[in-house]
């Protein structure tokens, strides 16, 4: 778009380009439509807030030049004053949307009187035009918390699982600890416009779901405000971007990692900074055991595959062992803990090998349980994969 007489910029939308729907470019979410039946001229979509009150859709063939796809709002019940997004669910073959709402009060476009908790609402659609099954997102064993955004997406390595990275909003009020934070004078100046601009702090959370409505939300921050420095510990920072990218590690031949991004310096000058953050693939949470040990017994499960792999990390003295049991909890011959040599290292897909090898094809399709015994170790994920023969190892001293 042209800005101040020049097109040498990265601006995709300006108010004039969405004037027909009185669109707000500050409240948009662009996604590449993964629906295989999506027309080529609408491969990219943009969810945008407009008037009359609601969410509208833009479309584009290249993700750069957008046009209005709906001249009427497709979703009207919500606050929409933050991030609102949609995507194609490849497992359930439908679109799903998540948007900003409040649990009480009125936010209908005519009256702005929000109350209750800043919350997330969701719905599904076959065509992006008619949205059904609207519901507020629910949480298991998590107290009420103010969530500004949602950043929900299917995890690309396990698309049946939804992952979200909402920004948590906490108003700490005026206190000695708040006044000891960096940028005190700026904080006091912002508070003249609105007290919460000085007293609120935001950080990033992590949550997952298998149905898109009921989420397991970890109450501990996934992204903390970090070390004290100028411009930190403010309202608006630590908003994890929507999406993640698999990137090469900077550590030589180490495996790929995940890159996520978040803004910093939200109130510093006229622009914000973006920071890249990295973590191991699947490394969002882990089953962690101390040196004295700990264990996990899974629910009964049925698998398809020939080998069991672990995304795991241990200390030099740590270990993991795996036992396969039948549905009643009886260890299966050849797959007991005693049959499993200690596994140690740090890998994304270590094959579990018992004394007789790693072949589990004879158990495929049967109901089993897995027992994990850990010492000073983390287990991030496990997966059954197609069978590969055991490697031929050299014999020490030969």
Describe the residue ranges of each PLM region.
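Carbohydrate-active catalytic/glycan-binding domains of CAZyme proteins
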Residues: 1-398
């Amino acid at each position: 778009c042209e800005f101040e007489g020049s097109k040498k910029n990265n601006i995709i939308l300006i108010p004039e380009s969405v004037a027909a729907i009185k669109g707000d470019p500050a409240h948009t979410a662009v996604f590449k439509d993964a629906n295989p039946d999506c027309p080529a001229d609408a491969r990219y979509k943009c969810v945008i807030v407009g008037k009359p009150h609601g969410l509208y859709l833009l479309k584009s063939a290249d993700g750069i030049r957008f046009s209005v796809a709906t001249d009427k709002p497709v979703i009207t019940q919500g606050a929409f004053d933050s991030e609102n997004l949609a995507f194609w669910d490849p497992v359930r073959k439908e679109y799903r949307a998540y948007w900003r709402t409040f649990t009480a009060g009125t936010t209908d476009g005519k009256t702005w009187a929000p109350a209750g908790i800043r919350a997330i609402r969701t719905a599904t659609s076959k065509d992006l035009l008619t949205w059904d099954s609207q519901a507020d997102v629910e949480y298991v064993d998590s107290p009420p918390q103010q969530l500004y955004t949602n950043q929900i997406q299917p995890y690309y390595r396990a698309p049946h699982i939804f992952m979200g990275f909402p920004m948590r909003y906490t108003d700490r009020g005026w206190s000695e600890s708040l006044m000891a934070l960096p940028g005190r004078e700026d904080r006091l100046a912002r508070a003249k416009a609105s007290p919460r601009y000085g007293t609120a702090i935001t950080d990033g959370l992590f949550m997952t779901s298998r149905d898109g409505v009921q989420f397991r939300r970890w109450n501990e921050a996934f992204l903390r405000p970090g070390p004290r420095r100028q411009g930190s510990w403010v309202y608006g920072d630590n908003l994890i971007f929507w999406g993640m990218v698999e990137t090469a590690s900077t550590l030589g031949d180490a495996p790929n990692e995940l890159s996520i991004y978040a803004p910093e310096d939200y109130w510093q000058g006229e622009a914000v900074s973006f920071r890249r953050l990295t973590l191991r693939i699947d490394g969002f949470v882990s089953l962690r055991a101390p040196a004295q040990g700990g264990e996990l017994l899974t629910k009964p499960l049925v698998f398809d595959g020939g080998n069991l792999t672990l995304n795991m990390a241990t200390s030099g003295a740590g270990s993991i062992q795996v036992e396969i049991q039948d549905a009643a909890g009886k260890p299966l011959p050849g797959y007991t803990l005693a049959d499993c040599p200690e596994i140690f290292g740090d890998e994304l897909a270590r094959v579990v090998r018992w004394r007789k090898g790693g072949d589990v094809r004879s158990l495929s399709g049967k109901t089993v349980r897995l027992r994990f015994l850990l010492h000073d170790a983390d287990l991030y994920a496990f997966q059954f994969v197609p069978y590969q023969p055991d490697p031929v190892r050299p014999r020490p001293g030969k």
